[in-house]
A protein has these predicted regions:
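S-adenosylmethionine
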Residues: 1-438
Length: 438
């Protein structure tokens, strides 16, 4: 069967659903290999992310129609992908969905397999019956409607109330923006003008400076990206480095740096300083170095393979003017870009990660100079990983205090900022800024 959007999407979904692969990595590899034209590439991307985002909802639609065990590995992903098109892609006729599903089933099925008849029968039944949902007062109504595991749906409701929780979950099921940040070393006005001429139609972020949403993908294949004028970075993530007050000659530490987006953003502000980038994995630090070279700040970045929880075994106390702890987290703010997280993470994972984050905070904070600045951030919106960790850290370190901060477009008068995904249609993020007392 000829390679097209649906073959690429199905192959990717088989890896994600059956093997637990990361959707973004698997899809990027598949798209590079397939070299699809723009429209086909966009459809493949939509099919992969949409199917995973709505997987729980789609499984609920299919569960009463699947009477036999789905033995062949392509059948479940194909049914889910087809159901996604039926319920969410109005521009794709149902007849086309059925025809393409039959072609894929015959192409992927074993010789003499009747899998395609099974797929065809289930999809016809789905079309006849239509959508089903739990009763509105049922405990799992929001879970199914918003395609979130019940524990996570309940968690959002418990923390933000039913109305806001539903908006947050709906935002997580929307399409992620194609966001870039223009290097501080590049002429912003010229780059914006050139991006517009290249038909990327950049729209300025209301949240972060030098951040823009593009009307289409493919920026990484252009000279804008290759020459280090822009990098791919969500607007909420771009806010983290903006929380610092740089003079330009500081010694900075990025304690959890890979893949290096924030390391580079810090380095751009240090013409006479340096940022030391840590990561526990040597392989990931190679990516940091590659990105620093591409963005023309390699001379300002030094890397070290080290577990941040052992930082004081290697560095001297009060060695750094600025410290960033962009801590490993549950990724609950990234459910739009990494939709499978909702199905793989648990409440226990959040608790475990919160402990690791606090360990890093406790360890690395001892490396901050008196009067220096420490920024703690996560790409999670959980209370345990954010506000609760801040409370615990301050209770254990009376020599530290939260420090109000203001970026070019937003302020945090209490020293903490939580960006919920429905506020700006961005990733969810948390930032807290500390300084030492006295």
């Amino acid at each position: 069967m000829k390679t097209n959007a649906r073959t690429v999407a199905l192959a990717t979904l088989m890896k994600v659903i059956n093997q637990g692969s990361y959707s973004n990595i698997s899809l990027n590899h598949a798209l590079k290999a397939a070299k699809l034209p723009g429209e086909e590439s966009r459809l493949a991307t939509n099919l992969v992310y949409g199917t995973i985002q709505y997987q729980l909802y789609l499984e609920y639609q299919l569960k009463d129609l699947v009477k036999a065990r789905l033995r062949e590995p392509y059948i479940k992903p194909l049914l889910l992908m087809s159901a996604y098109q039926i319920f969410f892609l109005d521009k794709v006729p149902n007849r086309a969905v059925l025809d393409e599903a039959n072609k894929l089933a015959k192409a992927y099925g074993r010789p003499k397999s009747s899998g395609y008849r099974l797929v065809n029968g289930i999809l016809h039944s789905l079309l006849r019956r239509g959508e089903v949902l739990p009763e509105k007062d049922a405990p799992d109504y929001l879970s199914v409607k918003c395609s979130m595991p019940l524990w996570l749906s309940d968690y959002f409701v418990a923390n933000w109330g039913k109305s806001r929780a539903e908006k947050i979950m709906a935002s997580f099921n929307s399409k992620a923006k194609n966001e870039i940040r223009i290097s501080a070393l590049a002429d912003e006005k010229r780059v914006v003008r050139d991006l517009d001429r290249a038909h990327f139609a950049p729209q300025e972020s209301p949240l972060a400076s030098r951040s823009y949403a593009l009307s289409r993908g493919g920026i990484v294949m252009t000279d804008f990206f290759k020459d280090g004028e822009v990098t791919v970075q969500d607007e909420a993530a771009s806010l983290v480095a903006e929380a610092f007050d740089f003079k330009g000659n500081e010694q900075a530490l990025d304690a959890c740096s890979a893949p290096g987006g924030k390391t580079i953003q810090i380095a751009e502000q240090l013409p006479d300083g340096q940022v030391t980038a840590l990561d526990i994995h040597e392989k990931k630090l190679r990516l940091v170095k590659e990105n620093a070279a591409r963005m023309r700040v390699a001379d300002r970045v030094k890397v070290k393979a080290l577990d941040a929880r052992k930082a004081r075994e290697y560095f001297s106390r009060q060695e750094f003017d600025k410290i960033l702890i962009d801590a490993p987290c549950s990724g609950l703010g990234l459910l739009r870009r990494k939709p499978e997280i909702r199905y793989t993470k648990t409440a226990e994972d959040i608790s475990h990660l919160a402990e690791i984050q606090l360990d890093i905070l406790n360890e690395v904070s001892g490396l901050l100079k008196k009067g220096g600045e420490l920024v703690y951030s996560t790409c999670s919106i959980s209370v345990e990983e954010n506000e609760e960790n801040v409370r615990k850290f301050l209770a254990a370190h009376p020599d530290f205090a939260l420090k109000p901060f203001e970026t070019a477009k937003i302020s945090a008068p209490k020293g903490m900022l939580k960006i919920l995904p429905d506020s700006y249609n961005s990733d969810g993020f948390f930032i807290a800024k500390f300084t030492t007392r006295g």
